[in-house]
């Protein structure tokens, strides 16, 4: 394959082992790699942007191996990709990668994910983009995930990568020889039991820690072919899931079921 110009970001921060493994995997295949990541952990920030404070970026090539340019950015994951595309890169990249995330990005959790948001920023700019996550917060071997992410991205580019397609790849927490086959999957609908831990600081002010737990994954919910498993079900078989996502959130249900009263009897202007 012709060497690619690849932009890599994440939400775990520029020091995270997952993104360093992904950058090394891409560089080892001869690609030109630029990493632009938050300067600290920014997980679950979704597609948030920094608009009330300045964004700062500094070169940190020494944190990465040969052939990798790296920047540490004070902004969110989406900020990182925006800044890279507008200011830091000399040329438009061929591919945007985000990850490898330290934990899953499954089902409707993608709405909260900084990892997916960084990739989505690439998609919104008309670029092929892939988000990759290891579906366990404790797992720390990112080599298989990094190599599989590169395989998927290179194969997709060599075949056909449609416009507005974001690929969301989740890898089970196991070694390659124990892993099942990669399959296309649907996005599951995840329901949480929201729990907040109430605490009091030394100044007698109350504060809270969010500690919700998944209580239900709706296997039959969501769009997509019925013969595709959900991403959650696929991971539970120790097999990687690959879910196609797009930025268009327009409702695909029965339009006749929309509450007509919302737009009825509006005054003429």
UniProtKB/Swiss-Prot annotation:
It catalyses: a ribonucleoside 5'-phosphate + H2O = a ribonucleoside + phosphate. Its EC number is 3.1.3.5. Its cofactor is a divalent metal cation. Keywords: Cytoplasm, Hydrolase, Metal-binding, Nucleotide-binding. It is found in: Cytoplasm. Binds 1 divalent metal cation per subunit. It holds the Pfam family SurE. A divalent metal cation binds at residues 11-12, 43, 101. Its main location: cytoplasm. It comes from the Bacteria. Transmembrane segments: none annotated. GO terms for cellular component: cytoplasm. GO terms for molecular function: 3'-nucleotidase activity; 5'-nucleotidase activity; exopolyphosphatase activity; metal ion binding; nucleotide binding. Belongs to the SurE nucleotidase family. Nucleotidase that shows phosphatase activity on nucleoside 5'-monophosphates. This is 5'-nucleotidase SurE. It comes from Prochlorococcus marinus (strain MIT 9313).
């Amino acid at each position: 394959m012709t060497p690619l110009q690849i932009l890599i970001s994440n939400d775990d921060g520029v020091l995270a082992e997952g993104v360093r493994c992904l950058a090394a995997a891409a560089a080892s295949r001869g690609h030109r790699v630029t990493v632009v990541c938050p300067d600290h952990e920014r997980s679950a920030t979704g597609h948030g942007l920094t608009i009330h404070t300045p964004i700062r970026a500094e070169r940190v090539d020494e944190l990465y191996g040969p052939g990798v340019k790296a920047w540490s950015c004070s902004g969110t994951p989406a900020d990182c990709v925006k800044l890279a595309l507008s200011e830091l890169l000399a040329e438009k990249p061929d591919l945007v990668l985000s990850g490898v995330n330290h934990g899953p990005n499954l089902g409707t959790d993608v709405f909260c994910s900084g990892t997916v948001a960084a990739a989505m920023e690439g998609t919104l700019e008309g670029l092929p983009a892939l988000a990759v996550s290891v579906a366990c917060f404790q797992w720390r071997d990112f080599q298989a995930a990094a190599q599989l992410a590169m395989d998927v991205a290179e194969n997709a580019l060599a075949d056909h990568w449609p416009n507005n397609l974001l690929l969301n790849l989740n890898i089970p927490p196991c070694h390659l020889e124990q892993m099942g086959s990669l399959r296309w999957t649907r996005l599951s609908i995840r329901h949480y039991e929201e729990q907040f831990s109430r605490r009091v600081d030394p100044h007698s002010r109350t504060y809270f820690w969010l500690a919700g737990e998944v209580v239900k994954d709706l296997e039959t919910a969501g769009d997509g072919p019925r013969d595709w498993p959900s991403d959650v079900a696929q991971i539970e078989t120790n097999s990687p899931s690959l879910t196609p996502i797009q930025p268009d959130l327009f409702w695909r249900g029965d339009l006749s079921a929309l509450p007509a009263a919302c737009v009825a009897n509006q005054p003429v202007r």
